[in-house]
Regions:
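Short, compact, well-ordered microdomains
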Residues: 83-118
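Short, extreme N-terminal segment that most often corresponds to the first beta-strand
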Residues: 1-21
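Hydrophobic, Leu/Ile/Phe/Ala-enriched alpha-helical segments that form helix-helix packing faces
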Residues: 17-22, 55, 118
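Surface-exposed, low-hydrophobicity interaction/linker segments
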Residues: 33-94
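Short, surface-exposed beta-strand/loop "edge" segments at domain boundaries and coil↔beta transitions
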Residues: 9-15, 38, 73-74, 102, ...
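Intrinsic-disorder-associated interaction segments
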Residues: 6-10, 44, 58, 107
Length: 118
């Protein structure tokens, strides 16, 4: 797990994280999005470029973002650590209170890249 405080540099942090955690076949599944702006991030599936554009609007209060391998979909509710492990995501980013980001992954290389990107 990597913890990040994205205060006034939130856009730079988001852009770096998406780049660090995305591979050539990554699709991002967003759920539980709560944002200040209607044109920003919403629940759904995004390519890395689409996600960067949605995040650039800013105002993300809360969201869960799952980096999924292409061809794999998030199924069922993800509420526990066991659910995260079973869902097959490459990484999970949780944003709370507009600025606190937690990055979870079983891949140590992804966590290292996330820490360096922030």
């Amino acid at each position: 797990m990597v913890s990040i405080l994205a205060d006034e540099s939130a856009d730079r942090v988001w852009q770096g994280l998406v780049g660090a955690l995305s591979g050539p076949d990554t699709l991002w599944t967003v759920d539980s999005a709560d944002c200040f702006y209607d044109e920003g991030l919403r629940d759904g599936i995004y390519t890395p470029d689409e996600l960067r554009a949605a995040l650039a609007v800013g105002g993300v209060c809360f969201a869960r973002l799952f980096a999924m391998p292409r061809g794999r979909r998030l199924e069922g509710e993800v509420k526990t650590h066991a659910d995260v492990r079973a869902c097959g995501c490459e990484a999970l980013v949780i944003c709370t209170d507009c600025a606190y980001l937690e990055v979870f992954s079983q891949n140590a290389d992804l966590l290292e890249r996330a820490a360096q990107a922030a």
